[in-house]
UniProtKB/Swiss-Prot annotation:
Keywords: Cell cycle, Cell division, Cell inner membrane, Cell membrane, Cell shape, Cell wall biogenesis/degradation, Glycosyltransferase, Membrane, Peptidoglycan synthesis, Transferase. It is found in: Cell inner membrane. UDP-N-acetyl-alpha-D-glucosamine binds at residues 10-12, 128, 170, 199, 250, 295. This is UDP-N-acetylglucosamine--N-acetylmuramyl-(pentapeptide) pyrophosphoryl-undecaprenol N-acetylglucosamine transferase. HAMAP family: MurG (MF_00033). The keyword Nucleotide-binding does not apply.
Length: 365
């Protein structure tokens, strides 16, 4: 069995692909798995680290700005697309995969499109509530389309072969809250707020936390991933504090989730898959510049199901937002209800189910 995965640009597209690939290898040790990506996306480093071979293509997405540099880069897009289609044609001719799997991002477009043109089975996995342009186009000819949200069906112009499977996510070890709080040297009797905004961080969230730090620490424990861009400056200003653990990155995310009574974070698809898998109540602050504002719609899906509180990026620094979060963190019954609602939305078996569908497509040919 030979499979080709394509998805990249951001971790939200790459890591689901890696999770599916690893699950397939767990049951199909002889499967040959390759990836297609770009040298500028996170996949260029993340995929080889997992031991998978990588084909690089020159495709690039359309820039949404209007600066001279961005306009110039957009002029190159058609040429890069044509070169990428040609490269993907050659890859498919040479490798002859049984199935091609696309997990989103512009990089998945050329290889999945070429595979469909050659009648090679294709499977699309979409992470976001509002599917991107690439997914909508490729879904028309895909063998199967796997979605993470029920409401995503309204954007897919077909009903057969469409499944709401959930978003593949990494697996976490289970820990008792007291054990996890002790890991971060925090008071086991206090409510704990977990704040994170990705590897780079989220400046608006960081500023909202730091501006009221004394008040947060007076009442709660705080586990705070600042991201690497703001960490040095924040560390210089605040030093070490009681009831506070902070760093640029959280390596032991399983411990952080276990310690947390409430999470404040962005609304990327992978993050939401993790918090619903674990049944964590959350305050979601969508990144306002995400493509097609997809983080807002991701967050709205949880908020509409009373599993999360949605606060827009422009409002996270307001006094009313701080008061609302603090009130929520002290409301045990509401946290419990949100946790139950979050867990209902979780799809912990997504990785296994999608892997099984890929294997079946490969066997059917």
């Amino acid at each position: 069995m030979k499979l080709i995965f394509a998805g990249g640009g951001t971790g939200g597209h790459v890591f689901p692909a890696i999770a599916i690939a690893q699950e397939i290898l767990r049951t199909q040790q002889n499967a040959e798995i390759q990836f297609v990506g770009t040298e500028r996306g996170i996949e260029a480093t993340a995929v080889p680290k997992q031991g998978f071979p990588m084909h690089l293509i020159p495709v690039a997405g359309v820039k949404r700005g209007f600066s001279p540099k961005e306009l110039f880069e957009n002029l190159k897009v058609p040429m890069r697309l044509q070169r990428s289609l040609s490269a993907c044609h050659d890859i498919l001719q040479r490798e002859k995969p049984n199935v091609v799997i696309g997990t989103g991002g512009f990089v998945s477009g050329p290889i999945v499109w070429e595979a469909q043109s050659k009648k090679i089975p294709t499977l699309i996995q979409e992470q976001n509530s509002m599917p991107g342009v690439t997914t909508r186009l490729l879904s028309l000819r895909a063998s199967e389309v796997h979605l993470s949200f029920e409401e995503s069906k309204t954007y897919i112009r077909r009903t057969n072969g469409v499944f709401v499977t959930g978003n593949p996510t990494r697996q976490f070890q289970s820990h008792r809250p007291a054990q996890a709080k002790a890991f971060f040297s925090l008071d086991s009797t206090r409510k704990t707020l977990l704040v994170f905004g990705g590897s780079l961080g989220a400046r608006s969230i960081n500023q909202a936390i730091e501006s009221n730090l004394e008040e947060w620490l007076e009442k709660f424990n705080l586990i705070w991933q600042t991201g690497k861009l703001d960490f040095a400056d924040i560390a210089t200003r605040i030093g070490s504090r009681k009831n506070l653990w902070y760093n640029a990155f959280i390596d032991q995310m399983d411990m952080a989730y276990a310690a947390a009574d409430l999470a404040v974070c962005r609304a990327g698809a992978s993050t939401l898959a993790e918090i619903t898998h674990l049944g964590k109540p959350s305050v979601l602050v969508p990144y306002p510049y995400a493509a097609a504002n997809h983080q807002f719609y991701n967050a709205k899906s949880l908020a509409d199901n009373h599993a999360a509180l949605l606060i827009e990026n422009k409002d996270i620094g307001l006094e009313t937002s701080k008061t609302e979060i603090m009130s929520l963190l002290q409301n045990e019954s509401r946290l419990k209800q949100m946790s139950e609602n979050s867990l209902k939305l979780g799809k912990p078996h997504a990785t296994r189910i999608i892997a099984e569908h890929v294997i079946r497509l490969a066997e059917l040919g």
